[in-house]
Swiss-Prot record:
Subcellular location: Cell membrane
The UniProt record lists the keyword Cell membrane: yes
Annotated positions for site Cleavage (non-hydrolytic): 235-236
Complex and partners: Heterodimer of a large membrane-associated beta subunit and a small pyruvoyl-containing alpha subunit.
Primary location group: membrane
EC number: 4.1.1.65
Enzyme class: lyase
GO cellular component: plasma membrane
GO MF terms, alphabetically ordered: phosphatidylserine decarboxylase activity
Protein name: Phosphatidylserine decarboxylase proenzyme
Pathway given in the UniProt record: Phospholipid metabolism; phosphatidylethanolamine biosynthesis; phosphatidylethanolamine from CDP-diacylglycerol: step 2/2
Enzyme active site: 78 (charge relay system), 132 (charge relay system), 236 (charge relay system), 236 (schiff-base intermediate with substrate)
């Protein structure tokens, strides 16, 4: 199953990256935009993308404004927040009724502190596929975990136990603006060609080699709130674990990168 889902995703990624003659590619792009009801008002027109992958990974034409105050946490991506809550004895939900252990997802030996709040950001095929820093960060490690590439949509989340933990993923281990530990987890999915990280091109995902690898940064990599951390090559999920933060009521709400979603408490 692992080999099949990953092989299918590699094949899809290769096809999505193929550049057809411009008149054919324009038609393919137009069909994709129509099927998934993609709003291109913030992006280049569909004829400007030389492949489906270029359309998937489109960049914003203009920077989005966001609150620069250091105590404000912003949405890292355009997404539907499917679950969010404080951890309960290290348990988080991938979807209602489907718990998993947070420490297993992020790659820690011990359970996470109950002060962690988590939020699942589901990026659908129509969404902007880049992910950004939710606050000023110092990235200490990037942990790559090999795994399956099962779909991360709601039917799949209801069907498959421990889906996030079993899927390929990259966990960014960081310090937030207050110096507290923060985890930013990019979860792979079926037909996601790759997950890319702008601060370290050495991080390889959806490769044939099936191994776990840790990339350590000393000194830490400093990024500013709103900085582009990377992108999926198709929609998937970001899981954010963050401490000492008062979040808004977010469950089942769609958010855009740059929207204020919470406020840090004083330590």
């Amino acid at each position: 199953m692992v080999a099949l889902s990953n092989a299918l995703s590699r094949v899809f990624g290769s096809l999505a990256g193929y550049e057809f003659p411009s008149f054919i590619q324009k038609g393919i792009n137009a069909l994709y935009v129509k099927i998934f009801k993609i709003d291109l008002s913030e992006f280049e027109p569909l004829e400007n993308y030389k492949s489906l992958n270029a359309l998937f990974t489109r960049s914003l034409k203009k920077e989005r404004p966001f609150d620069k105050a250091p105590n404000i946490c912003i949405a890292p991506c355009d997404a539907l927040i499917t679950e969010c809550a404080f951890l309960d004895n290290d348990s988080a939900l991938q979807i209602k009724g489907m718990p998993y252990k947070a420490h297993e997802l992020v790659g820690e030996i011990n359970p996470l502190n109950p002060s962690f709040f988590y939020a699942n950001f589901y990026l659908s095929p129509k969404d902007y596929h880049h992910y950004h820093a939710p606050c000023d960060l110092e990235i200490l490690e990037a942990r790559y975990f090999a795994g399956k590439l099962l779909p991360v949509n709601k039917p799949s989340l209801h069907k498959n136990n421990n889906l996030f933990v079993g899927n390929e993923r990259v966990t960014l281990v960081a310090k937030d603006v207050q110096g507290n530990r923060l985890y930013f987890v990019a979860v792979g999915a079926l037909n996601v060609g790759k997950m890319r990280f702008n601060f370290d091109k050495n991080i390889q995902t959806n490769a044939k080699a099936r191994f776990t690898q840790t990339y350590s940064y000393n000194p830490p990599i400093k990024v500013k709130k709103g900085d582009n951390l990377g992108n999926f090559e198709m929609g998937s999920t970001i899981v954010l674990f963050i401490q000492n933060t008062a979040f808004k009521d977010l469950k089942e709400k769609s958010v855009k990168f740059g929207e204020s979603i919470g406020e840090f408490h004083a330590n």
